[in-house]
Amino acid sequence: MEQPEDMASLSEFDSLAGSIPATKVEITVSCRNLLDKDMFSKSDPLCVMYTQGMENKQWREFGRTEVIDNTLNPDFVRKFIVDYFFEEKQNLRFDLYDVDSKSPDLSKHDFLGQAFCTLGEIVGSPGSRLEKPLTIGAFSLNSRTGKPMPAVSNGGVPGKKCGTIILSAEELSNCRDVATMQFCANKLDKKDFFGKSDPFLVFYRSNEDGTFTICHKTEVMKNTLNPVWQTFSIPVRALCNGDYDRTIKVEVYDWDRDGSHDFIGEFTTSYRELARGQSQFNIYEVVNPKKKMKKKKYVNSGTVTLLSFAVESECTFLDYIKGGTQINFTVAIDFTASNGNPSQSTSLHYMSPYQLNAYALALTAVGEIIQHYDSDKMFPALGFGAKLPPDGRVSHEFPLNGNQENPSCCGIDGILEAYHRSLRTVQLYGPTNFAPVVTHVARNAAAVQDGSQYSVLLIITDGVISDMAQTKEAIVNAAKLPMSIIIVGVGQAEFDAMVELDGDDVRISSRGKLAERDIVQFVPFRDYVDRTGNHVLSMARLARDVLAEIPDQLVSYMKAQGIRPRPPPAAPTHSPSQSPARTPPASPLHTHI
């Protein structure tokens, strides 16, 4: 047996969550009717893109397009390639300049206008194509030159027309590829005293900083030194993040029941090598570096052979969004008495003039991201567990805006306004029943199952669920519909029942029937409370954790129903007067992160 340093614990291999990087999208920039700053010709525009740090909110230059001479309607060739995270608010800023010299110093060029948006706004627009007016923000003086410079605030001069910016997002093709492969091994080292080894493979993707991230683990083959593992599939972006020459490290272990797996050896390869398929290039010597150092006659600890390799493109979340799939967002808020009297500062519903309460923080964190995937920005908002005026009837499915026919509110601000108004008119009561609001959203989801709509229900609650059996049944029934459920637990209650509904460990069932999909994600709000008061950062983490599973849940539903993405809508054509004076096409240029 090897020394303890050649052993690995089981936990090292089982945490694969979050190992798949975001997909990459390519942003193309065009402008129409820019300001004309040149006396005897048209402007020579350049676009600069900035990203914003989540922690310090500082704008950082991401990249620049090329300069296009003598046009007010540029179609820039150089693209911006960025990582896309559905679950994050990725703020972007685009500044336009009229270039007057070869100087890279932007202060030496005329400012033409700017636009702010999020990456989600671009992706979620029809056809993933967003048009925004350019504005000239407030100016400040450059401390070195004294020349006016645009401030980074989102201010604008009322009535000042600076033209339009057109932003298009396209998912990179290699981000949708899925590789399917199979391996076998020969003459692996024997690690067990009373039998042969129980080998398995662990695959790692190399990172920019030289570290490695686990991305796949095969099954264990019992009692053999010549295993043939099952075929497996993995997204190419998980294997190499789209870089075909990036190192892929594969470690070979002998499985042990107590979790102290014995290291047999390792080898490295790359996606480009694997893509050659079965050949002499894909027979790898398994080497144990420690044995190689200690033993002069050491050759290897066996070989691993690639038996087959194939790659195909799969439909992705962005394919469906670009094809017009709308995400319908509904929020349901807990109005039970366990929240405490809203007029007292100890209440979870207390409305402080200085900061948002937990309900409003959670709603805003999730809503401000998901809102960009719904074109009309009208969101149903429900309450449960309250007595309603005028007769004190208890309801577990009432509209926050008071409109029984149409519970939709305009934007996230509209939901917050209706929520605050409800706190002043209803009486907190109980019990904590989820089934009515789950059934409400499921009913709407069932009405449209052609792939054009997908519903997301956000439930924010403080208490122990009262109708567990009914809620389980409602979720099992909803799992076959185009919908997902997010539950955020606020306050200090025990949320064991919510963890059960989450179904990450054990898929929930009702009356002996298993849910077809895992559609519930639960997080306790207290895990995201920042003691320093930095709610921006902590709520960004909350949104990331509860929204991260939505894209895969949407795609899993579409696949199960055999629904393919629709073709994206055609981009509007511009009148001849707006046609750009195009620069001759050049070979594609890209700006990477």
Curated annotation (Swiss-Prot):
UniProt-annotated binding residues for Ca(2+) 2: 38, 98, 100, 110
UniProt-listed SUPFAM superfamilies: C2 domain (Calcium/lipid-binding domain, CaLB), vWA-like
Keyword entries, A-Z: Calcium, Cell projection, Differentiation, Metal-binding, Phosphoprotein, Repeat
Cofactor(s) in the UniProt record: Ca(2+)
Domain (C2): residue spans on this chain: 2-134, 161-284
Annotated binding of Ca(2+) 1, by residue: 38, 44, 98, 100
Binding site for Ca(2+) 3: 100, 103, 108, 110
Subcellular location field: Perikaryon; Cell projection
Phosphoserine PTM sites in chain numbering: 19, 103, 140
Highest taxon of source: Eukaryota
Binding positions (Ca(2+) 5): 192, 254, 256, 262
Domain VWFA, residue spans: 328-554
Tissue spec: Expressed in the brain, heart, stomach, spleen, lymph node and testis. Expressed in melanocytes.
GO terms, molecular function: calcium-dependent phospholipid binding; metal ion binding
Cellular component per GO, a single term: extracellular exosome
Regions of compositional bias (Low complexity) in chain numbering: 572-581
Predominant cellular place of this UniProt entry's protein: other
Cofactor descriptive note: Binds 3 Ca(2+) ions per C2 domain.
Xref: InterPro entries: C2_dom, C2_domain_sf, C2B_Copine, Copine, Copine_C, VWF_A, vWFA_dom_sf
Record: residues binding Ca(2+) 4: 192, 198, 254, 256
Region (Disordered): 562-593
Pfam families registered for this protein in UniProt: C2 (PF00168), Copine (PF07002)
Biological processes annotated in GO: cell differentiation; cellular response to calcium ion; positive regulation of dendrite extension
Function: Probable calcium-dependent phospholipid-binding protein that may play a role in calcium-mediated intracellular processes. Plays a role in dendrite formation by melanocytes.
Family: Belongs to the copine family.
Name of the featured protein: Copine-5
Provenance organism: Homo sapiens
